[in-house]
């Protein structure tokens, strides 16, 4: 599977075209809208979420609630575009209109793509950069991820994300009986945290940051259960599944680090306390006593739950702006303020789910793929039976 997105933050709409989704996948707009609504929730979101109520329109590739195997086009309208029609319109402006335009951006914000992008593409108005580099684009990435999650769910593979740290407040390791219970607890938490006490402290940390005109980041974790053994490859560097997952997580706006399983903790332990011992039983076949590897070894799945974490830096748009330089005058200035969140870590956990689901669905279809969901399901069942008796 592959997809491409298009659209600007304050343009008329966001669009994604998805290719390679097998025929026969049950899919309706509500499957996607549910994920879009989850992305818009979370303590610390800004006023933009009060303006936009994201709803998807399925333009092609689905008929009567089932995918056709042809490209799927999804569109999400930007309701705020009504206030930006002149500024973000596609038609040329007159010289007078250009002079009157009040939203020209010449002061790059530290931590954003503004200055680097303006230099790269030669834009004197950095709105041309910030409109596309905005995290608003993750709306349609979540839409694409919703399709991927649907593919995985039909194959018995479940994906769930949650927040384990915000602003230095760390959640205690919390046990849960099933991934469905994990989902239930996190959906009830304003910060999508399993640890209620830590969640309340996270809320206070967000409030403190907001009152100071500042922002805070954190860490999200994505857990996936039900992946067959051996998905991915050890043969070439670019086919290793852990590498693809790491790249996907790092592609999320403001993410600055990724770890799989115990990750960087492995540097502090001897090998005997890192590697997962292999066991076999008649019911499940091969499994592991522990899951320090996070479900991935040698670029392939082990059959254990996949565990991926991502670090999100504080959002760089601040109401207490940092110093910058005006690219027209070269004079120092405090950076311009765009409407923003004080903390987007809870929402980022939903985006992380989406990108992880996409990579896993793509890998599953590549390995077991045909053009029909029923045949892919049969292939996985045969593979699992083979692996148990290997």
Curated annotation (Swiss-Prot):
Under the heading SUPFAM superfamilies, the entry gives: Chorismate synthase, AroC
**Which reactions fall under this protein's catalytic activity?**
5-O-(1-carboxyvinyl)-3-phosphoshikimate = chorismate + phosphate
| Gene3D superfamilies cross-referenced by the UniProt entry | Chorismate synthase AroC
Annotated FMN binding lies at 132-134, 253-254, 298, 313-317, 339
Top-rank taxon, per record: Bacteria
The chain's disulfide connectivity reads none
Q: Which keywords does UniProt give here?
A: Amino-acid biosynthesis, Aromatic amino acid biosynthesis, FAD, Flavoprotein, FMN, Lyase, NADP
Reported cofactor(s): FMNH2
Q: Is the keyword Ligase in the record? A: no
**Top-level enzyme category:** lyase
Entry-linked InterPro entries = Chorismate_synth (IPR000453), Chorismate_synth_AroC_sf (IPR035904), Chorismate_synthase_CS (IPR020541)
In terms of HAMAP family, this protein maps to:
Chorismate_synth
Family classification: Belongs to the chorismate synthase family.
According to UniProt, the name of this protein is Chorismate synthase 1
Q: What is the lineage of its organism?
A: Bacteria, Bacillati, Bacillota, Bacilli, Bacillales
């Amino acid at each position: 599977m592959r997809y491409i997105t298009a659209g600007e933050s304050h343009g008329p709409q966001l669009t994604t075209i998805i290719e390679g989704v097998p025929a026969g996948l049950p899919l309706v707009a509500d499957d996607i809208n549910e994920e879009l609504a989850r992305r818009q929730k979370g303590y610390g979101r800004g006023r933009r979420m009060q303006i936009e109520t994201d709803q998807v329109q399925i333009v092609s590739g689905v008929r009567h609630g089932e995918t056709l195997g042809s490209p799927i086009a999804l569109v999400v309208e930007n309701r705020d575009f009504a206030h930006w029609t002149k500024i973000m319109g596609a038609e040329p402006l007159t010289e007078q209109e250009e002079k009157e335009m009040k939203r020209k951006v010449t002061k790059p914000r530290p931590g954003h793509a503004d200055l680097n992008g303006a230099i790269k593409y030669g834009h004197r108005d950095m709105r041309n950069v910030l409109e596309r580099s905005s995290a608003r684009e993750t709306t349609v990435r979540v839409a694409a991820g919703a399709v991927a999650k649907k593919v995985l769910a039909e194959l018995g593979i479940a994906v769930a994300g949650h927040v384990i740290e915000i602003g230095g407040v760390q959640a205690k390791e919390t046990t849960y009986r099933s991934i469905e219970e994990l989902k239930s607890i996190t959906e009830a938490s304003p910060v999508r945290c399993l640890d209620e006490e830590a969640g309340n402290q996270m809320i206070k940390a967000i409030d403190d940051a907001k009152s100071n005109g500042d922002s805070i980041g954190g860490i999200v974790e994505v857990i996936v259960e039900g992946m067959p053994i051996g998905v991915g490859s050890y043969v070439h560097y670019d086919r290793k599944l852990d590498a693809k997952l790491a790249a996907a997580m790092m592609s999320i706006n403001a993410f600055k680090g990724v770890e799989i399983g115990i990750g960087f903790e492995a540097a502090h332990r001897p090998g005997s306390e890192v590697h997962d011992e292999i066991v076999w039983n008649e019911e499940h076949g091969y499994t592991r006593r522990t899951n320090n590897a996070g479900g991935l070894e040698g670029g392939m799945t082990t059959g254990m739950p996949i565990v991926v974490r991502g670090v999100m830096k504080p959002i760089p748009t601040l109401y207490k702006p940092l110093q910058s330089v005006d690219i027209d005058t070269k004079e120092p200035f405090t950076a311009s303020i765009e409407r923003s969140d004080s903390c987007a870590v809870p929402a980022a956990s939903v985006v992380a789910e989406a990108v992880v689901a996409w990579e896993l669905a793509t890998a599953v279809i590549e390995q077991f793929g045909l053009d029909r969901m029923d045949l892919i399901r049969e292939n996985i069942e045969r593979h699992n039976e083979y692996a148990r008796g290997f």
